[in-house]
Amino acid sequence: MKKKQTKVKQTVKLVLRNPLSISWPIVDANTQEKLAQTLVQWLPASHKDILDSKLTVGLNSVNELLERCCQNAKDVTQPAVVFILHDQDSMLVTHMPQLVANANFYGSSKCRLVPLGFSAQALIAKKLGLSRAGAIAVQDDSPLWKYLKDLVMNIEEPQARWLSENPEYEVTKVEKIITSQKENQGTKKEGKNEKGNEFKK
């Protein structure tokens, strides 16, 4: 008696890799946890103290600060670090790596970008006496900076190399992702990405 064969269906998906996109900095879970704990411990608990502590709190406020850093870098003090309290794939913050990279290009100092995830937001917002806190920017003359500096200095700041005076040509790559699915079981396996095809002018 012949053994029943399982049919495997393969699907090919093409993914465009934009060479001009800026990736989120890589921050390990242990560092994220330490930074979240440090913020909960040392953040002020009143609105007046937030202003006195050289902090900018709230996603819209941090957005506006970084935009001013790009537009008028000489007159606006760039933050030393920006903490994002949303998950990286949230549409609310997908622009943040690019925005910080732009501010780093135009500014005289460098700003780190640290994603802490949405799970850290509740405790941090509670400490600040707020209902939510999507982002926090910390100046290097803030009282908090001395507690954060050693933890964030090894995190690479976002940079847009293509904004430099002599940018290198970056090819656009299309990666081929092959997935396989057993038709009789409905289970799906992700295959490895194949080397991308390069499209040049």
From Swiss-Prot:
Keywords: Cytoplasm, Nucleus, rRNA processing, tRNA processing
GO cellular component: cytosol; nucleolar ribonuclease P complex; nucleus; ribonuclease MRP complex
Places the protein is found: Cytoplasm; Nucleus
Coiled-coil portions: none
Residue span of region Disordered: 180-201
One Pfam entry name: RNase_P_pop3
Feature: compositional bias, Basic and acidic residues: 185-201
One Gene Ontology term from the biological process aspect of the record: tRNA processing
Domain of life: Eukaryota
Subunit structure: Component of nuclear RNase P and RNase MRP complexes.
Record function comment: Required for processing of 5.8S rRNA (short form) at site A3 and for 5'- and 3'-processing of pre-tRNA.
Family: Belongs to the POP3 family.
Listed name of the protein: Ribonucleases P/MRP protein subunit pop3
Organism: Schizosaccharomyces pombe (strain 972 / ATCC 24843) (Fission yeast)
Name of the gene encoding the protein in the UniProt record: pop3
